């Protein structure tokens, strides 16, 4: 089975040109031409160009990487890390929301509850999952899952990847703000350890609703903010084209957020981003999740809850 065609971001043009040249030379080599040495030299140049490019990414470029269509999504992490996964559907009040996936399974032999936003990877799946923007029933499903996990003493893992909660009229009529607030409260009130990983976009209350965890991890090129750069640009300058300027001002990168104490750990991505080696990224994430839960193991419910609340109170005091 052939690999999917690689998708390049605008700022990756120099790397795209080198990769294209490599493909041309490999085709010639396959026809009998002895140009292996030349191919090796250009491959070395391409690796160097990629390393230099990704060592100096701007916040706006990181935003583009976080949204890359080939970046591993929630379903990929579940498939790579969770065995015996059994999804649960519906909020028992209105209906099912496929933007938010949740269920129970095993992580390295131990029971776990997994909740995550799924953006989809094709036109069909993006529409099915509403581009990862959950409606009220999605957040109420998350509350239902967290309540079950708490009752049975099962740790909770959140995989965060959303531009934000869905802002449609129907969602607002069904109590979007209340659903987000209750989900956030459920996260904070858990007596079992919970770990959140921002794997792509962490947008606004839609992300926070499942990310108020004992440990918050974030991929190197993910973003986490109260509003998207495009929306901030429209509000601040009445000009949606100034998204790049907004991103550069908003402190949305993992590096900024670690410095502010909003997150606990940055997970390094493969050179060129998680989309260049999804399997390696998923393995790295799995190791970090295991270490985070190991650190929280053995704590009683009161301590787990108190530490989590203190963590977020400290963020408020520090940045408020």
Curated annotation (Swiss-Prot):
The answer to whether the entry has keyword Translocase is no
Gene Ontology terms, cellular component aspect?
Answer: acetyl-CoA carboxylase complex
Recorded catalytic reaction(s): these are: N(6)-carboxybiotinyl-L-lysyl-[protein] + acetyl-CoA = N(6)-biotinyl-L-lysyl-[protein] + malonyl-CoA
- Pathway note: Lipid metabolism; malonyl-CoA biosynthesis; malonyl-CoA from acetyl-CoA: step 1/1
User: Which range is the signal sequence, renumbered to this chain?
Assistant: none
Q: Which residues form the CoA carboxyltransferase C-terminal domain?
A: 42-295
Similarity annotation: Belongs to the AccA family.
The record describes its quaternary structure and partners as: Acetyl-CoA carboxylase is a heterohexamer composed of biotin carboxyl carrier protein (AccB), biotin carboxylase (AccC) and two subunits each of ACCase subunit alpha (AccA) and ACCase subunit beta (AccD).
Q: Which HAMAP family match?
A: AcetylCoA_CT_alpha (MF_00823)
What's the protein called, per UniProt? Acetyl-coenzyme A carboxylase carboxyl transferase subunit alpha
Annotated organism of origin: Rhodopseudomonas palustris (strain HaA2)
